[in-house]
Swiss-Prot record:
The keyword Transport does not apply. It comes from Streptococcus pneumoniae (strain ATCC BAA-255 / R6). Keywords: Cell cycle, Cell division, Cell membrane, Chromosome partition, Cytoplasm, DNA-binding, Membrane. One of its GO terms (biological process) is positive regulation of chromosome segregation. Disruption phenotype: Nucleoid defects. 15.7% of the cells are anucleate. Unaffected localization of the divisome. Chromosome-partitioning defects. Newly replicated chromosomes are not segregated (in 7% of the cells) or partially segregated and eventually truncated by the newly forming septum (in 21.8% of the cells). Segregation defects result in small cells, which constitute the majority of the anucleate cells (86.3%). No defects in chromosome replication. Chromosome-pinching takes place as nucleoid is asymmetrically distributed in elongated and constricting cells. It is a peripheral membrane protein. This is Regulator of chromosome segregation.
Length: 163
């Protein structure tokens, strides 16, 4: 049993202007409105219930509806709204998951860069240490060569001058 009413029909029942009702209908969620065969906007039963709550008036008196049916329909509306909220939050969570994945990837890249820099620094330190050892060895060889030259010179002069 599908109850739908046009804006004009609702305005007539409530005794309000069509424009006032049209403005209210535009504020309703999409699921509370539809288009009929002629392309005219109609308000569904759930939308009519919401309008009844807004205006505190009964819109469709000719069809008696039990309190159980009203309660069930109200519950369906609430469940639909909660489901929409759950979907919105789920989409938000998916977006956060994507952001976290991107951050994780950025962290992995940074970790690789840090490891590479550590390796380069270690290599540089090893090269510096080797260069210092080579320099020390060359200095020792130079000092040794100087001593040999000095001893050779002394030996030559000592022999020359009878020493």
């Amino acid at each position: 049993m599908s109850i739908e009413m046009t804006v004009s029909e609702i305005a007539e029942v409530l005794g309000l202007s069509r424009q006032a009702i049209n403005n209210r209908v535009k504020e309703l969620p999409e699921e509370d409105t539809d288009k009929n065969d002629k392309g005219v906007t109609v308000v569904t039963r759930s939308g009519l219930i919401k309008l009844e709550e807004i205006y505190k008036k009964t819109i469709f008196e000719d069809e008696p509806v039990s309190e159980d049916v009203k309660q069930r329909e109200l519950m369906e509306i609430l469940v639909d709204e909660k489901n929409a909220e759950i979907l919105r939050l789920y989409e938000q969570l998916k977006a956060k998951d994507r952001q976290l994945s991107e951050k994780d990837e950025q962290m992995r890249i940074k970790d690789r860069q840090i490891a590479e820099k550590d390796k380069q620094l270690d290599q540089q330190q090893q090269l510096t240490l080797q260069a210092m050892k080579d320099q020390e060895n060359l200095k020792l060889e130079l000092d040794q060569a100087k001593e040999e030259v000095q001893s050779t010179k002394k030996g030559f002069f000592a022999r020359l001058f009878g020493g």
